[in-house]
Design a protein with these regions (language model features):
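Compositionally biased, low-hydrophobicity segments enriched in charged and small polar residues
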Residues: 1-3, 130-136, 200-203
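Alpha-helix initiation/capping motif
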Residues: 9, 16, 147, 172, ...
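Context-gated lysine
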Residues: 10-13, 67, 131, 197
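Alpha-helical structural motif
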Residues: 12, 16-19, 23, 154, ...
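A short, well-structured juxtamembrane/interface segment
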Residues: 26-42, 191-204
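Glycine-rich phosphate-binding loops that contact phosphosugars or nucleotide phosphates
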Residues: 36-37, 41-188
Length: 205
């Protein structure tokens, strides 16, 4: 057993290193999902709501969309909704547990004002709320992980949703395969159990 493996065995009781290595599997799995059941609409924009790691994808989507999308995409990390929001804005609510208090508050407000919500979670109150709404959809992701380790599932699902709804230009299957391959190769170079870059960098700190 290497020194690095000994450290992991001693301190990484939740197997974050293992979950991190499986990030690309989670991402690839999410990219292969089909969201054809979600109808297109004449949205004025998209508001991504979520907290912490569950909300991080909204930040990335906002940045990506500012360069490539035809609609404005904003994110919200708080209770309720911004004062300018109206039901002509689609709400995409992400909460890994499905029970995040702030996110549930945003969803309840959106539904109460006649809005449409796409929710992404592993279950919880978010799923229950959206099952009761005719204008909303819940998309499930695998549970059983720590929220911070589930970013591949969450962001991959968000991005796939944007592609399927035509909110962002969708890459070809070949482009997706090449992207995943590049990410895996780069990650392996920095994985102390596989490559040497991380160890070499640590020695210079």
């Amino acid at each position: 057993m290497s020194e690095y493996e000994e450290l992991l065995d001693k301190f990484d009781k939740s197997d974050m290193a293992g979950w991190t290595r499986r990030f690309f599997d989670d991402l690839e799995s999410a990219f292969q999902r089909d969201f054809g059941m979600i109808e297109e609409n004449d949205w004025h924009g998209v508001l991504c709501v979520g907290m912490g790691g569950s909300g991080a994808g909204g930040t990335y989507l906002s940045t990506i969309s500012s360069k490539a999308a035809g609609l404005p995409v904003h994110y919200w990390r708080d209770y309720g909704l911004p004062s300018w929001w109206g039901p002509e804005w689609l709400v995409i609510a992400t909460s890994y547990s499905g029970n995040t208090e702030e996110t549930i508050s945003s969803v309840e407000m959106a539904l109460g004002e006649g809005g449409s919500v796409v929710g992404i979670s592993s279950g919880g109150r978010l799923e229950d709320l959206l099952k009761e709404s005719e204008n909303s959809v819940h998309i499930g992701v695998p549970g059983g992980q720590m929220p911070r380790s589930a970013f591949g599932h969450l962001f991959g699902t968000q991005l796939s949703l944007f592609w399927c709804m035509g909110l962002l230009p969708a890459p070809s299957n070949q482009e997706l395969e090449e992207m995943i391959a590049r990410l895996r190769s780069s990650a392996e170079e920095w994985d102390p159990l596989v490559g040497t870059k991380a160890v070499d960098a640590a020695r210079h700190i």
